[in-house]
Amino acid sequence: MGGYKGIKADGGKVDQAKQLAAKTAKDIEACQKQTQQLAEYIEGSDWEGQFANKVKDVLLIMAKFQEELVQPMADHQKAIDNLSQNLAKYDTLSIKQGLDRVNP
């Protein structure tokens, strides 16, 4: 669980964020599929009436919302991956090395 010299970032926490983001993305996709399937099941069932329609409509809204979370989660995962890669390179950057010489 190392940090990065010159940056207040905990490598272990960054790795944990990567793992949690991947799990969250997977869970959102699974939840969206289940919600969509439930709405379709209700639509094809014998359950009728205003309440059934409202339940189905709510489920469809939830499925759409969950679907709209997929791309932002993918962007979030990419950002965390980029952060991890760039933090690992930070100490080798020439500007960082120059700053270390000026401000030891």
Curated annotation (Swiss-Prot):
**GO cellular component: a single term:** extracellular region
For the null mutant, the annotation states:
Increased capacity to promote cytokine release by host dendritic cells. Does not modulate the apoptotic pathways of host cells.
Concerning its family, UniProt says: Belongs to the WXG100 family.
Q: Assembly and partners?
A: Homodimer. When mixed with EsxA does not form heterodimers. Forms heterodimers with EsxD.
Q: Which organism is it from?
A: Staphylococcus aureus (strain USA300)
| Subcellular compartments | Secreted
Task: Identify this protein by name.
Answer: Type VII secretion system extracellular protein B
Among the Pfam families in the record, one is: WXG100
> What is known about what this protein does?
Virulence factor that is important for the establishment of infection in the host. EsxB is required for EsxA synthesis as well as secretion. Mediates together with EsxA the release of S.aureus from the host cell. Also inhibits host cytokine production and thus modulates dendritic cell-mediated immunity.
Q: Altering N53A: what's the impact? A: Complete loss of interaction with EsxD
Q: Which domain of life is it from?
A: Bacteria
Q: Give the InterPro entries listed for this entry.
A: ESAT-6-like_sf, T7SS_ESAT-6-like
Which UniProt keywords are listed? Secreted, Virulence
